[in-house]
Swiss-Prot record:
GO cellular component: plasma membrane
Topological domains, Cytoplasmic: 1-24, 120-128, 201-221
Statement: the UniProt record of this protein carries the keyword Cell membrane: yes
Pfam families per UniProt: L_HMGIC_fpl
General function of this protein: Probable component of the mechanotransducer (MET) non-specific cation channel complex.
Organism, scientific name: Gallus gallus
InterPro entries cross-referenced by the UniProt entry: LHFPL
Name this polypeptide is given: LHFPL tetraspan subfamily member 5 protein
Extracellular side: 46-98, 150-179
GO biological processes: detection of mechanical stimulus involved in sensory perception; sensory perception of sound
Record carries keyword Metal-binding: no
Residues spanning the membrane: 25-45, 99-119, 129-149, 180-200
Localization, UniProt: Cell membrane
Length: 221
């Protein structure tokens, strides 16, 4: 084996560190994506987007599709709503928000399923596919969060939050943790998408150009 020149040796060291850093970033991105998918499933299912306060006429809380409102006589919570039965969802805005947040959740889960493609396809391509899926998920979450308050004027929400409740005006009710997490999820999805694009470009440029040239020259010799 011919003795490496200093420039070639430096290029190999650079390449080794470059690959190691790219793999470490890839592992972190995958872990964050997995955690984010769990967060999105919880946000989609849990009915804690808005809820009662000490000033509301009735106790209760609302989610994207399910909600619970207290009985005026007994105080017992009566729960309704199902993602499979649109007729039980109290507002068309809630239905639309559920659709977009649901699609976003499936896109994030789909990006995790794409991890298996790393064994069969070019890594840069897989990263970029996941990046576009996560960017689309961020868009869906943004639309869902913007549309959801449009349904606050429904009769069921007014029964819990009071007559002062209207579109984008919550009256006596308060925003709950699931809605806040969904808003934070928009930023999370954008960051994950940006990181995936960066990782995809790093894979495209995995080898330094000078190292590629020198390697070709060695092969010709």
């Amino acid at each position: 084996m011919p003795k490496l020149l200093p420039a070639q040796e430096a290029a190999r060291i650079y390449h080794t560190n470059y690959v190691r850093n790219a793999r470490a970033m890839g592992v972190l991105w995958a872990l964050f994506t997995l955690c984010f998918s769990i967060l999105m499933v919880v946000t989609f299912i849990q009915p804690y987007w808005i809820g009662d306060s000490i000033d509301t006429p009735q106790a209760g809380y609302f989610g994207l599709f399910s909600y619970c409102i207290g009985n005026a006589l007994t105080g017992e919570l009566i729960c309704k709503g199902s993602p499979l039965d649109f007729g039980t969802i109290p507002s068309s805005a809630f239905k639309t928000a559920m659709f977009f947040v649901g699609i976003s959740t499936f896109l994030i889960i789909g990006s995790i399923l794409c991890f298996s493609l790393f064994f069969f396809c070019n890594a840069a391509t897989v990263y970029k596919v996941c990046a576009w899926m996560q960017l689309a998920a961020a868009t869906g979450l943004m639309i869902g969060c913007l549309i959801y308050p449009d349904g606050w004027d429904s009769s069921e929400v007014k029964r819990m939050c009071g007559d002062k409740t209207d579109k984008y005006t919550l009256g006596a009710c308060t925003v709950r943790w699931a809605y806040i997490l969904c808003i934070i999820g928009i930023l999370d999805a954008l960051i994950l998408s940006f990181l995936a694009f960066v990782l995809g470009n790093r894979q495209d440029n995995l080898l330094p150009s000078d190292f590629k040239v020198e390697s070709k020259e060695e092969g010709n010799e």
